[in-house]
């Protein structure tokens, strides 16, 4: 029900056989403040990562601070081997950024370590270094175009 609080272990839904889908999947939304689509947030910021992993959130921006939409970003671990991790920044208008973070991308279940965040665009490579710690949201910002 709208406004209902949930705790770890609460059943939120059950799998059924109604509707049309090509395979099992879950639609999960987090809504903050109001029960409408304009209040959605990225659920990866609200879900605990897998044990011994962290979450990376950040911003990919132009030199004037404007968010860049659908920019590809990857994480390369510098201090040891790690699984390939990549995503794109949000499309314009969705999902909505967290009102405190103002992020435009999130990656979950990232193995802890020292990483280089990489955005390649227009034949140029932009990087930022970050440490990823387990059990928390780790932050990085890349300015593209300087």
Q: Predicted segments — roles?
A:
Residues 29, 72-76, 118:
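Beta-strand signatures of extracellular beta-sandwich domains
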Residues 62-90:
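Short, ordered, surface-exposed loop/turn motifs in non-cytosolic proteins
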Residues 56-62:
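A short, amphipathic beta-strand motif
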Residues 22, 111-112, 134:
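Surface-exposed loops/turns
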Residues 97-116, 120-123:
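Short Pro-Gly-centered beta-turn/loop motif in secreted/extracellular proteins
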Residues 121-146:
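Structured interaction patches on ligand/partner-binding surfaces of diverse proteins
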Residues 2-55:
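Conserved, short, structured surface segments that act as functional micro-motifs
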